[in-house]
Amino acid sequence: MIYVSRRLLITCLLLVSACVVAGIWGLRSGAVTLETSQVFAALMGDAPRSMTMVVTEWRLPRVLMALLIGAALGVSGAIFQSLMRNPLGSPDVMGFNTGAWSGVLVAMVLFGQDLTAIALSAMVGGIVTSLLVWLLAWRNGIDTFRLIIIGIGVRAMLVAFNTWLLLKASLETALTAGLWNAGSLNGLTWAKTSPSAPIIILMLIAAALLVRRMRLLEMGDDTACALGVSVERSRLLMMLVAVVLTAAATALAGPISFIALVAPHIARRISGTARWGLTQAALCGALLLLAADLCAQQLFMPYQLPVGVVTVSLGGIYLIVLLIQESRKK
């Protein structure tokens, strides 16, 4: 029988409840504020047609994609931090979301607004970047510090490459890409969720299936190898899952920073344990991104900020607080 601590169970239930409450609030909020009863009526198909369209065609895709993208980024960050055994191990710092964004830019310049091409190019960009960082960091094995430093260097080069692409693109493409680069959920509809959303769901399932390997790797390479785990193959497979999660999220909403870095930290702090780490990180990531999107919509009405601006601001503050706390401990 699997024992689950009371605090962990309560934490997960509270996170789920908070996601539901924030989701309902997101369906109520907008240029026209609705009552909760009107939202449920629209979801059941009992509301006027115009109200049903506002809720189900405009607001519901945005809320669900915020939850899904946040969960994907949270799980991706938790996998990277587990593999690197380093609190700074995340796709933001390593440059993998920048690689995915490079793929998106190339697709926009070459293929315009084709969603399938954008999603596939984002994944190719993220995977190629991760393989490049992996190969450059390989020296009879992978050293975590070397991997992070090389990732930061590759990210800097990709930022320069992306700037060059924007300068070479047409004005319309550059403006569209500039908005996307800030990380935005504005204008998300059901038609724009494919094929990225199904890919995220598949990768979340794959991550759940790899939890046992991840836990064994956290015990140390020698212990994992003694228990029959192929260390480098498992590490590469888990990194691939995390990179595809990041790339698919980037294809949907652009490069949204700090969710992958912050969500696993918050999950561990509020639950006091690393058990169910991916589940906690997914719930925290989903709640953080949805809350940030609600702030982006509501704080500066009638203007809407890109959600990436809010996540960078909040994530930067959290990172500063975290560093201050760590320095005081020492």
Swiss-Prot record:
Cytoplasmic compartment spans: 29-62, 114-117, 168-190, 257-275, 325-330
Cellular location(s): Cell inner membrane
Keyword check for Transport: yes
Molecular-function GO terms, alphabetical: ferric-enterobactin transmembrane transporter activity; transmembrane transporter activity
InterPro entries from the UniProt entry: ABC_BtuC-like (IPR037294), ABC_transptr_permease_BtuC (IPR000522)
Keywords for the protein's UniProt record, in alphabetical order: Cell inner membrane, Cell membrane, Ion transport, Iron, Iron transport, Membrane, Transmembrane, Transmembrane helix, Transport
Periplasmic compartment segments: 1-7, 84-92, 139-146, 212-235, 297-303
Induction pattern: Controlled in part by the amount of available iron. Induced 1.4-fold by hydroxyurea.
Entry GO CC: ATP-binding cassette (ABC) transporter complex, substrate-binding subunit-containing; membrane; plasma membrane
Keyword Transmembrane helix tagged: yes
Gene Ontology biological process terms in this record: ferric-enterobactin import into cell; iron import into cell; siderophore-dependent iron import into cell
Residues annotated as transmembrane: 8-28, 63-83, 93-113, 118-138, 147-167, 191-211, 236-256, 276-296, 304-324
Source superkingdom: Bacteria
Coiled-coil stretches: none
Topology versus the membrane: Multi-pass membrane protein
Stated family: Belongs to the binding-protein-dependent transport system permease family. FecCD subfamily.
Subunit and partners: The complex is composed of two ATP-binding proteins (FepC), two transmembrane proteins (FepD and FepG) and a solute-binding protein (FepB).
PANTHER family: FERRIC ENTEROBACTIN TRANSPORT SYSTEM PERMEASE PROTEIN, FERRIC ENTEROBACTIN TRANSPORT SYSTEM PERMEASE PROTEIN FEPG
NCBIfam families to which the protein is assigned, alphabetical: PRK10440.1
Name of protein: Ferric enterobactin transport system permease protein FepG
Organism in which the protein naturally occurs: Escherichia coli (strain K12)
Encoding gene (name): fepG
